[in-house]
Amino acid sequence: MESIMSLKRKEKKSQSRRLGKYLKEQKGRIYIIRRCVMMLLCSHD
């Protein structure tokens, strides 16, 4: 039987992993949006 401490540790690990995945997704979105904005700004003819 697992102790409460090890259970909480596992819970924290999964939360941080979830947060990391979320942040990585957001970074990707921001990068894509920045690229689009730069292209729009730089492509004025």
Swiss-Prot record:
Location in the cell: Cell membrane
Signal peptide: none
GO annotation, cellular component aspect: plasma membrane
InterPro entries linked to this entry: DVL, DVL/RTFL_small_peptides
Cystine residue pairs: none
Described purpose of this protein according to its UniProt entry: Small polypeptide acting as a regulatory molecule which coordinates cellular responses required for differentiation, growth and development, including leaves shape, pedicule elongation, inflorescence organization and fruit maturation, probably by restricting polar cell proliferation in lateral organs and coordinating socket cell recruitment and differentiation at trichome sites.
Name of this protein: Small polypeptide DEVIL 2
Organism: Arabidopsis thaliana (Mouse-ear cress)
Gene (UniProt): DVL2
